[in-house]
């Protein structure tokens, strides 16, 4: 398959940016899904030792990818301990 892509790129050089952007988009999507699977507190890989990982988060833990106007270092805890 890689040989076909290289052959098409040699025959039609205008396809090179298309291949670059499709490759970058696929790589970015794969990295984002990997980040969600490994670092998101909603995902539990070990149900016996840590069945509810979201309960161990403190109020200062930022697990969002990007936060516009919330400063997580200044938040106070509002809920009860579990």
Curated annotation (Swiss-Prot):
Coiled coil: none
Membrane-crossing segments per the record: 15-37
Mode of membrane association: Single-pass membrane protein
Residues carrying Phosphoserine: 67
Record-level GO cellular component terms: mitochondrial inner membrane; respiratory chain complex IV
Positions on the Mitochondrial matrix side per record topology: 1-14
UniProt KW keywords: Acetylation, Electron transport, Membrane, Mitochondrion, Mitochondrion inner membrane, Phosphoprotein, Respiratory chain, Transmembrane, Transmembrane helix, Transport
InterPro entries referenced in this protein's UniProt entry, alphabetically: B12D (IPR010530)
Primary residence: mitochondrion
Residues exposed to the Mitochondrial intermembrane side: 38-82
Residues carrying N6-acetyllysine: 10
Subcellular location: Mitochondrion inner membrane
A Pfam family per the record: B12D
Oligomer and partners: Component of the cytochrome c oxidase (complex IV, CIV), a multisubunit enzyme composed of 14 subunits. The complex is composed of a catalytic core of 3 subunits MT-CO1, MT-CO2 and MT-CO3, encoded in the mitochondrial DNA, and 11 supernumerary subunits COX4I1 (or COX4I2), COX5A, COX5B, COX6A2 (or COX6A1), COX6B1 (or COX6B2), COX6C, COX7A1 (or COX7A2), COX7B, COX7C, COX8B and NDUFA4, which are encoded in the nuclear genome.
Biological function: Component of the cytochrome c oxidase, the last enzyme in the mitochondrial electron transport chain which drives oxidative phosphorylation. The respiratory chain contains 3 multisubunit complexes succinate dehydrogenase (complex II, CII), ubiquinol-cytochrome c oxidoreductase (cytochrome b-c1 complex, complex III, CIII) and cytochrome c oxidase (complex IV, CIV), that cooperate to transfer electrons derived from NADH and succinate to molecular oxygen, creating an electrochemical gradient over the inner membrane that drives transmembrane transport and the ATP synthase.
Family listed: Belongs to the complex IV NDUFA4 subunit family.
Name of the featured protein: Cytochrome c oxidase subunit NDUFA4
Species of the source: Bos taurus
Gene: NDUFA4
């Amino acid at each position: 398959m890689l040989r076909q892509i290289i052959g098409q790129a040699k025959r039609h050089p205008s396809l090179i940016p298309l291949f670059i952007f499709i490759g970058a988009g696929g790589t970015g999507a794969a990295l984002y899904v990997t980040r969600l699977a490994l670092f998101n507190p909603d995902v539990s890989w070990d149900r016996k030792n840590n069945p509810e990982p979201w309960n161990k988060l403190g109020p200062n833990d930022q697990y969002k990818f990007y936060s516009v106007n919330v400063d997580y270092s200044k938040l106070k805890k509002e809920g009860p301990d579990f």
